[in-house]
Amino acid sequence: MGGKTTEQKARVREWMFWEFDRLAPNIYRPRAIKRGFMKVNDGVYEMYVNLAKDALNVLDSELGAGPFLTGSDATIADVAVYGDVAYAGEAEIDLSPYPNVKAWMGRVEKLPGFKKYADLLPQQDAA
């Protein structure tokens, strides 16, 4: 999952750094705000959402070139980026303007062993 060729391994690394720097903070911060974990004024929330939308535009554009981030096969970069994008709804970021992202998410969800994050978290016993 780390890439097959030297070039693909380099692209995986680029995506991992991009995810950490450009995508994750700008999805998780507005998510934290909407869930009440952070108290900020509306301008701060909107700033993070706009930065997330900028990142999603980049992602959508790049995904127009192929089924996965670094080519025809999924890599750890796809898993990492998916993990952030999956929380966009909780940040009240609409993914409908990003058709390539939505299609890619569907492909990631069809990978062997895929599970939604909610299915992996411990559940409180209802009894």
Locate predicted features.
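C-terminal helix/juxtamembrane-tail motif
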Residues: 114, 119-127
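Residue-level signal for nonpolar/aromatic packing positions in well-ordered secondary structure
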Residues: 12, 59, 78, 108-111
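GST superfamily/GST-like fold recognition
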Residues: 26-31, 69-97, 102-108, 115
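Alpha-helical packing segments of well-folded alpha/beta enzyme cores
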Residues: 48-55, 104
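Short amphipathic alpha-helical surface patches that mediate protein-protein
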Residues: 17, 32, 106, 122-123
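The C-terminal cap of the DNA-recognition helix in HTH/winged-HTH DNA-binding domains
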Residues: 64-65, 110
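GST-like domain detector, emphasizing the conserved glutathione-binding G-site
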Residues: 1-50, 60, 67
